[in-house]
């Protein structure tokens, strides 16, 4: 008799996705981040659920309810800090996952890649709205500044901003709707992640060499289940180290001051994982231009597959492209640093140069270097 895991309508879906899935035999630890993102999402939904049981989305009580969670709820402090730092771990995994896709040419799976970009936008929106909920100074002013960017849209901008606010400023209506969206979006992310996986399993995974691996596949379980468990252990170790030893390391001290519309903090800045985009936004002295650059800094990923001019899929055997890739990584780290600095000399010019370099590398240098490498292959 055939095993139930291969015949049962529900179990066979799990079997074909996580047990008997034919997987390339040579995928490295860089392929762990997909499963780690799944773990992050589950952790965030669970901790978020328990936080939502005690949180109140009202301007008068939101800040106090978060303090109440940390002080009075059993293990509320660890749930709150796991949720806050879990977001940071989520973005670390996201950036490494996207970086892996760029390096090894995984973007050639168009559907998987494009759904991944939609996922990235959705996670960023969710994280932004979550940051508003504690209703500290940085929550309030961050929400004010970022939602105000929509006013740069010609003709409908101002109406759009007031529609999102639910009034003439960030207030009770804004907080309530942000809480509602912050609660529902992770489930949309889970659905999108399932579709992401569905499209990936249509083609099978890429591998470091970028060469089709149909002739050399191994079952996902036990080889990669054990590898993923090891990755998960590292993830949880890092998360717990962060949440238990330095929970406020990545946060902003201003957010321990209750929101005050009459007092603007000296430096308004988002969480660290948005700083690179924030630096690109600030580097353009025009409001609409800055907003467009901000959106394009992520949306540029959509055209990466169209700009793939190399004869090889992966960068594994392309040293010039590798140099360019690591220059891009250094550039993004520079942008992240600049995003957290005040708007003054020399940070302004560094930010502008780093922003230009970011787009030049992705849109001009990468395709050009790939063509040069193709010609070098003929020698």
Swiss-Prot record:
Annotated heme b b562 binding sites: 83, 182
Q: Name one Pfam family in it.
A: Cytochrom_B_C
State the UniProt keywords alphabetically.
Electron transport, Heme, Iron, Membrane, Metal-binding, Mitochondrion, Mitochondrion inner membrane, Respiratory chain, Transmembrane, Transmembrane helix, Transport, Ubiquinone
What is a single cellular component term in the Gene Ontology annotation? respiratory chain complex III
Q: How is the cofactor bound?
A: Binds 2 heme b groups non-covalently.
Into which family does the record put it?
A: Belongs to the cytochrome b family.
This protein's assembly is summarised as:
The cytochrome bc1 complex contains 11 subunits: 3 respiratory subunits (MT-CYB, CYC1 and UQCRFS1), 2 core proteins (UQCRC1 and UQCRC2) and 6 low-molecular weight proteins (UQCRH/QCR6, UQCRB/QCR7, UQCRQ/QCR8, UQCR10/QCR9, UQCR11/QCR10 and a cleavage product of UQCRFS1). This cytochrome bc1 complex then forms a dimer.
Entry protein name:
Cytochrome b
Task: Read off the lineage from the record.
Answer: Eukaryota, Metazoa, Chordata, Craniata, Vertebrata
- Gene responsible for this protein: MT-CYB
